[in-house]
Each structure stands twice: as C-alpha cells, then as structure tokens.
Amino acid sequence: MLLRMTAWFWKSGLAVISFVLMFSISGCSDTPPEEDTVSETVIDVQDVSEEQENEEEIINICIDLYDKAAEENKLDDLEIIRSIVNRLGENGYPAVDSRNQVNMTEAEQVLEFCKKVDAQEVADITILEVGYLGGFVKYDLHTKDGNVDVVRSYYGYENGEIQKEVTGRYQAEYWNYTEEGYLMFSGVWFSEELYVLTLSGAEEHTALRVQPLDETYRELSRKYLLPISFEQNNMFIVDWSEEDFGDLNFYDMYDILYPKVNGRYVPYVADDNLSVSAVYRIPKEEFESVIMKYFNIDSETLQSKTVYDSEDSTYEYKPRGFEEVEYPEYPYSEVIGYTENSDGTITLAANVVFPYSGNSKVYAHEVVVRPLEDGGVQYVSNRIIPSEDNSEETWHTPRLTAEEWEELYGGE
C-alpha cells in the first residue's frame, strides 16, 4: 500500500490538500499535526543492533527475485509478490503481501506472539510485508507487560539494490487479533526524515491476514469485488436487486464503470470555480452503454433512477464537488464463501475489512453476479447481512440530493 502524508483541512465542506508526500510504505493514513513539536516519548524497544541483525540476511534471501522482477518489469505482479513471500517463509520468516492476497508464511509464529501479548510475557518477532511498488516493510515487534512496541522499516528496491529508506518507532495504541484471522494494530510513528518534512508523526493502521484463505475466494474478490470497491459509491453499502435497485446511485456507478468501458477517465469534470457546480448533458446512448454493460436494466428503469430529459434524449450529470469529498481511507470486501446457482449466477459471501478503523468485519454482505460468455459480468444484487455488530460506513459521503444541490447552487 502507499503511505500518503497529507495535511487535510476541513472547512465549509471543503477539503484542501496543503502538502503531499508520497512514500512507498504500507498501511498508513493521514493525520494533521496537533503540535509544532514532537513530544518526548521513551519506548522500550530492541537495541538498534538487534533490529538490524537480520536485515542483510533478509535482503540476500530475496534480492535475486527483485532483480528478475525488475528485468521483466513485473515488480507489481501478484505471482512475483507471491514468490517473494514464499521465499521469505522458506527461510523462517512470517511474511505476507500488503494487499492480503497471499497466505501468510510462518503464521504459527505470529499466533504464538499474540498469545504472549495476551499473557503479558516478553517476546519478539519480525514480520515482513511485501509491497507492490518494489519494496517491503519490516515490522520488528517487541512485547512486554501486554504492551507492543513497533519498529517499522521500509526497504525499497532500486538499481539492483535493496536499501532501507525510512524507519519509525511507536507503541501500538490499538492491538487486536480478530475472529476473522487478522492481526490489526495502529499507532503514531516518528522518524527523523518524516519530522523534518512534516513536523509531526504519521498515523499507521496495519491489517495483516494471518489465517489462510482459499485462493478461489481471493480470485473471486479480485475479479468481481475489488474493481468496484468502496470509493465514492454505495454499491456494496445499500440493499438493491434487479427487481428493485433501491438507493443504488447510478451516477457513482457511471464514474467507476466509464474507464472500464472506454479505457479513459470520465471527461465530465468539476468546474475550476469551486463556487460553481458543472452540469452536463450526456447523450442517451453514451450513458446507457456504460451502465448496461454491467447491469441488466432497461432504459425506462434507468431513467427513473436518474435525471433524464426526454426532449433531447440526454441524462443530466453533475460531477462530484468538494461538498461530496471523502476522506481517502477505504475498506475492501473479502470473499469468504460462494455458491454457484442453477441460473448461472454466483452468490458471493463477503466481509468488509477496514484497516483504518481496525475492524476486520464492519459488516457481512452477499453479492450476486452473473458471469457473461464474453468474460464480462453483470451485477445482480447486494444484500447487507443484518447483525447487531454491524458498524456504520463512516468512509462514505453520498452525492448531494437535488434539494441540497439547489440550496447550494440553484441561485446561480
């Protein structure tokens, strides 16, 4: 995953990015600085020599795989990532990929460490998280009296070498091994490099799947759920079906599906003047060709769920504005079971995993998909499984209603 160091200021419904620093690091989120000075924190962690004692060994274990991947321009290839994870495991290291698409190696070591945390015993472990940007994170964890201290170091591959680029330390403010088989922990880490640039620490939320998952489940997730995901849409948030599309927002779906259909970004963008909301008229054929490729829906039904002008046969389209911005941390759906139905559809049972909130099951839902002969797919329905343990979808900001839009821009 990518570490985004972004200072966000929320004012009058606007999100203004004041500074962006990109690191090839996994599992971190954005946090504004609360003070101009770093508080003096003393953490009982391993000596620097102990932290570095396995560094050279780890690099030597996998450097040839990185060389091969770079030569073939496949540093982000899943099978390459899998080979690196497995090589580390063969040499006794717990390892997993940053997208939790490969079963963790040496998971028993991690489970034993978690038991020692609960028992308030003293223990150490190194866990490696292989990223998709040509590098990996090394977590050196130390526990004592039930507290967990974290030393996280990022190693990047470049020009035939793997080098440590940044190291941070923190004590885990949140630590949990979940019923769904995830190790989730978080805290605010500091490093000299980071402080020079931001005068603050970085908030990190880490989610590592410890328990194995059937590869078929992961393939189904990658094929049907992850391409939609949760950013700026409610497809997996609300109940809907082909018989009743409910509150499914087809404008959000248009934004997500347009690039998949046309191979380029949606050309209908927000106005440069932030006080003005752009309004477009999209020809009927253009709008429907995007939606109907992924949904079995007729024109009449689609028109009833949108704003359609029958006089010129166009769909009104308003791109999301700053009032509809979302904080850039999202969950993902993970298939944990499936049923092949007699009508050719597939029912996917999935959990919503949200690393930012430290929750490996925000809620469970069922998604029905219809695979097509040409390799495509139609989405048939989504149903949230009722439970007292379900959490709210705090990441989502819906599009403005007609009334809200009129109140903001109607007088222009």
Segments (PLM) and residue ranges:
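Bacterial N-terminal signal peptides that target proteins for export
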Residues: L2-L14
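Hydrophobic helical h-region of N-terminal Sec-dependent signal peptides
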Residues: L14-L21
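C-terminal motif of bacterial Sec signal peptides marking the signal peptidase cleavage site
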Residues: S24-G27
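Bacterial signal peptide processing site
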Residues: S29-T31
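Mature, Sec-exported extracytoplasmic domains of Gram-positive
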Residues: E34-E412
